[in-house]
Amino acid sequence: MAEAIFKALLLVIATTAFATTEAALGQRVPCYFVFGDSVFDNGNNNVLNTSAKVNYSPYGIDFARGPTGRFSNGRNIPDIIAELMRFSDYIPPFTGASPEQAHIGINYASGGGGIREETSQHLGEIISFKKQIKNHRSMIMTAKVPEEKLNKCLYTINIGSNDYLNNYFMPAPYMTNKKFSFDEYADSLIRSYRSYLKSLYVLGARKVAVFGVSKLGCTPRMIASHGGGNGCAAEVNKAVEPFNKNLKALVYEFNRDFADAKFTFVDIFSGQSPFAFFMLGFRVTDKSCCTVKPGEELCATNEPVCPVQRRYVYWDNVHSTEAANMVVAKAAYAGLITSPYSLSWLARL
């Protein structure tokens, strides 16, 4: 715990150095591809028949382009990573991108997306991890992106949260919590993850950052439904731990088996501490900044929001504020929460 807090404080000290150093280097990687769920989605769900879309106010209240489908008040983690990699613009969503954009980068992430195909099906149309990879294959082949270029691109993946939030801990219409123990479910997810990660490798991915699942039991949603009035829902966090442990092991397995590639694990879970958040300027860690109606997860349309967004960790009942996204993105870039490589080191390869 002390180490995590110390690393978080180091992040604050290091932040101002990044902008100056990176400005002189120019774009760090030739292209950047994003896969995942609502934490990374920047508009793909806008055109889908789904309740998992946020192209309305107050989402985007602190984003220059307003509501775009990002599940936050401002920039999400891939946006900030794109800035740190010195891209001239944010990586566009797949649903609005031409094949030619595959030469620069595409965001395939979809709110509600999961490792399991049935995850989040009660929300409507969702682009699963498997389908995101299929879309990526189609785009890079249509655009005829050279393999040597794909080998130099950055790939970030954030997937798995919905397999717990909108599957395992939501019994109806799902039955996974009846079929699997915590360890068995994690093993099942990792088996699929291994296959999908191998597919990305075959498609040219050689610089890959795999984000673990955060402390879902500390989200306002799970505190309300599983917390029992005593803070974070310990059972939910306990369920996630074997997944993160196995995912980190998978990263090391791939580094061992594929010597021409570098994979790194981004450990969000271990770095989440109320005290560390407090030391970074956050004052509210268990409530949403925006107005969320009882039993709901997303912000209510055009309802009041908290006066100082940067003091809140959570924007709605699940998703982080831009300020919290900034902490995660810069910590991953600097290597404060990654193993074995920082994102900045991956970019230099």
UniProtKB/Swiss-Prot annotation:
Subcellular localization, as worded in the UniProt entry: Secreted
UniProt KW keywords: Glycoprotein, Hydrolase, Lipid degradation, Lipid metabolism, Secreted, Signal
Glycan attachment points: 49
Entry EC number(s): 3.1.1.-
One Pfam match: Lipase_GDSL
Source species, domain of life: Eukaryota
One GO cellular component, as annotated: extracellular region
Top-level class of the enzyme under EC nomenclature: hydrolase
Signal peptide: 1-23
Active site residues of this protein: 38 (nucleophile), 316, 319
Keyword Aminoacyl-tRNA synthetase tagged: no
Gene Ontology MF: a single term: hydrolase activity, acting on ester bonds
GO BP terms in the entry: lipid catabolic process
PANTHER family in the cross-refs: GDSL ESTERASE_LIPASE, GDSL-LIKE LIPASE/ACYLHYDROLASE-RELATED
Family: Belongs to the 'GDSL' lipolytic enzyme family.
Record's protein name: GDSL esterase/lipase At2g19050
The organism of origin for this protein: Arabidopsis thaliana
